Amino acid sequence: METWHMTAHGRVQGVGYRAGCAQAAIALGVRGWVRNRADGTVEVMASGTIQQLEALRNWMQAGPPAAHVARVDVEPGQGKFEDFDLRPTL
């Protein structure tokens, strides 16, 4: 089990990205959280197998139809999670 901290850049707010990301994470069995950031990015802390995390990162790069994802930054994360939550904007 690994934990990744991922940040999506581009047109990722106001397009259903956060909710879609949560749905994808839950479908993949990933635990953690997603939230919008005041700087216009979407931040994810996700815990799962490497295969689950790579699949979520691939979803994040594609995003929902209305999104335009410029890039997704990935770095090691931390935390233990029971489920996957939508968090308020920070």
Curated annotation (Swiss-Prot):
EC number from the UniProt entry: 3.6.1.7
Reactions catalysed: an acyl phosphate + H2O = a carboxylate + phosphate + H(+)
Keywords: Hydrolase
Entry keyword annotation includes Hydrolase: yes
SUPFAM superfamilies: Acylphosphatase/BLUF domain-like
Recorded superkingdom: Bacteria
Keyword Hydrolase annotated: yes
Domain Acylphosphatase-like intervals: 3-88
Enzyme class per UniProt: hydrolase
Pfam family, one: Acylphosphatase
Positions annotated as active site in the UniProt record: 18, 36
GO molecular function: acylphosphatase activity
UniProt xrefs under PANTHER family: ACYLPHOSPHATASE
Protein family per UniProt: Belongs to the acylphosphatase family.
Protein name: Acylphosphatase
Species annotation: Cupriavidus pinatubonensis (strain JMP 134 / LMG 1197) (Cupriavidus necator (strain JMP 134))
Gene name in the database record: acyP
